[in-house]
Regions:
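Cyclophilin-like peptidyl-prolyl cis-trans isomerases
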Residues: 28-213
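Short, Lys/Arg-enriched N-terminal segments with co-localized hydrophobic residues
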Residues: 1-6
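Bacterial N-terminal signal peptides
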Residues: 7-11, 15-28
Length: 213
């Protein structure tokens, strides 16, 4: 090999190494981007009740504040031993706030309403219960036994935030909805009151736990 050829090879080598390094970096960035674009799997929880099990998928991507709040209550064991205290057939079942003696459990501060996520209160969806104040939801939730679109956000009017849906156990929801109900005395944070639509026999939420991804 001539001296000229050796010099050319010496000059070319850094360029080849630079091109190779650039290709490796580009490939690494592409792989990282592809991984970041992978959809994050929504968390799931199992609600065990005296009438059967209900599995829920939570919409962490659409209702992040509400899901985080709910999961904190789950992790704290807040729902264990509470009841479905309000059951209205062909409407919804509501629970997560009162023990078997209908005494309200203490909660953290309420959260902001996320009903602008435009998720609909269709049959089988999980939504936050609240008072007339849109930003008053804390721990109580309900499962829509039928589609209740009038509860949705509409025309600037806040609705009831949907943050999950039943993926297994809707038959249990239907069974609960058919239970005999009546009036019962309850102890709320604001004092004693009388509730309507309380199951004659308590339907207890034995536990709510996260499911492995």
């Amino acid at each position: 090999m001539t001296e000229m050829s050796m010099r050319n090879m010496t000059n070319l080598l850094p360029r080849l190494l630079s091109c190779l390094l650039a290709a490796v970096l580009s490939l690494s960035m592409s792989v990282a981007q592809a991984q970041s674009d992978d959809p994050v799997e929504n968390p799931r929880v199992l609600i065990k009740t005296t009438d059967g099990d209900i599995t829920i998928e939570l919409f962490a991507d659409k209702s992040p504040i509400t899901v985080e709040n709910f999961l904190q209550y789950v992790d704290d064991g807040h729902y264990d031993g509470t009841v479905f205290h309000r059951v209205i057939s062909n409407f919804m079942i509501q629970g997560g706030g009162f023990d078997t003696e209908l005494k309200e459990k203490p909660t953290r501060d309420p959260i902001v309403n996320e009903s602008k996520n435009k998720l609909h209160n269709t049959r089988g969806t999980l939504a936050m219960a609240r008072t007339s104040d849109p930003d008053s939801a804390a721990a109580q939730f309900f499962i829509n036994q039928r589609s209740n679109l009038r509860l949705d956000w509409s025309g600037g009017k806040d609705g009831y935030t949907v943050f999950g849906e039943v993926i297994d156990g809707m038959d249990v929801v239907d069974i609960i909805s058919l239970t005999d109900v009546g009036r019962a005395h309850a102890q709320t944070a604001y004092g004693p009151t009388v509730f309507q639509d309380v199951p004659a026999e308590p339907i207890v939420i034995l536990s709510v736990t996260r499911l492995a991804p």
